[in-house]
């Protein structure tokens, strides 16, 4: 591949990424989510069924992706803001080794589950073509919103989407 072809591809990718980011959230008509099966950092296999009954923010990311890393602190703030509510944030690392993920986590402490997708099989199954891509699932495990590109999860439209999905759940008794 020539430098000109490579630069052309890079430019096209950037134009697509900016357009995707500017497009905001894609609303889905309660689409059933594809299968998700991945190991967490402790080696336990997790599936979407493990999170049934909760709103799920499923974020596909990689440690080499600057926009992914920029939005991670806002996901942590959202987790703190929603403590005690039926929301789970899951970050699925796409196509990296455990060593690469561990090196990243040595620099940034995160309190939400990190799942590993070293062969990229979940990324392909979910048709993720750019990082970060985030799916908001309702408590029944259906995709309701998709966002390609980074956002501040603890404010604005992103927070409103999470709150709207939480509002659909039956009221929880005080704890």
Residue spans for each PLM region:
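Hydrophobic beta-strand core positions in alpha/beta domains
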Residues: 57-59, 89-91, 135-136
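Non-globular targeting/processing and membrane-anchoring segments
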Residues: 169-175
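Thiol-based oxidoreductase modules, predominantly thioredoxin-like and allied folds used
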Residues: 86-98, 112-119
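Bacterial N-terminal signal peptides
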Residues: 8-18
């Amino acid at each position: 591949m020539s430098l000109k072809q490579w630069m052309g591809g890079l430019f096209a990718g950037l134009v697509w990424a900016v357009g995707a980011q500017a497009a905001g959230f894609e609303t889905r008509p309660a689409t059933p989510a594809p299968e998700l099966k991945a190991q967490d950092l402790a080696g336990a296999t997790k599936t979407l069924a493990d999170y049934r009954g909760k709103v799920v923010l499923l974020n596909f990311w990689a440690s080499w992706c600057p926009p992914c890393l920029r939005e991670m602190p806002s996901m942590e703030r959202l987790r703190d803001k929603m403590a005690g509510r039926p929301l789970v944030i899951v970050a699925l690392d796409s196509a990296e080794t455990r060593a690469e993920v561990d090196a990243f986590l040595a620099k940034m402490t995160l309190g939400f589950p990190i799942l590993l997708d070293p062969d990229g099989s979940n990324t392909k199954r979910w048709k993720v073509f750019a990082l970060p891509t985030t799916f908001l699932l309702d408590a029944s495990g259906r995709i309701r919103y998709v966002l390609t590109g980074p956002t501040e999860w603890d404010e604005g439209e992103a927070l409103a989407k999470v709150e709207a999905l939480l509002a659909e759940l039956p009221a929880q008794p005080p704890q």
